Amino acid sequence: SIFLRSLKLSLMTTVLTLLVGFPTAYFISTRPEKTREFWLFLITIPFWTNLLIRTLAILVIIRNEGLVNTILLKLGIIDAPMQILFTDTAIMIGMTYVYLPLMVLPLYASMEKLDFRLIEAGYDLYAKPMQVLRKIIIPLVKPGMIAGSILVFIPSLGAYVTPSVLGGGKNMMIGNLIELQFGQGRNWPLGSALSITLMIIVMAALLVYVRNASKTGAGHG
């Protein structure tokens, strides 16, 4: 169903933004203080442009004659253009690009407070990089991970513009279905029911965040 599809795409988008945003935020937090503002400025640049324009920029890159296919063809990795546009993959790529700053900024806020002496102590005790990441860094930046995940999951679940442009109207999400019921379908009762269901899911996600934030705060206290 469209609801399950929307949940899957939103969760996968959240995971992708976390995988990209985590090393990005760590990189920024380890830069000299004078250059951090510059890197944060680059991260926030997309917010200065309209959502539709940002989505159209991705469309140009992943279309059959776009940058991705052109590079892969010239490198001989593929023989014919890949059909990325108008697929779930295109929607995930688009939403990951659009919502990435919402993941990076909370992660950076947590990583900025990291005591890097703990990381150095871990290496002094011959801990491997993955052990340092798993046992030191992740527990300390968990609040930022949770906050970023919620900030990405909620808007991606109700996304309308990005699925419409990159999905081509064939791969609908909840937001598209709601618009269809209120617009062309003229089925306002169903549209209202879908909207309320979406609000319940969003409230549940917020409740999870509040509970985790409370536990984290209690743990630090």
Model regions and ranges:
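Loop-to-helix entry region at the N-terminal start of transmembrane alpha-helices
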Residues: 2-6, 73-102, 144, 149, ...
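Membrane-interfacial helix termini and adjacent extracytoplasmic/periplasmic loops
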Residues: 55-96, 130, 166-170
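Transmembrane alpha-helices
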Residues: 15, 41, 45, 97, ...
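Hydrophobic positions within alpha-helical transmembrane segments of bacterial inner-membrane proteins
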Residues: 10-22, 26, 107, 140, ...
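Periplasmic/extracellular loop-to-transmembrane helix junction in inner-membrane transport proteins
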Residues: 1-15, 183-186
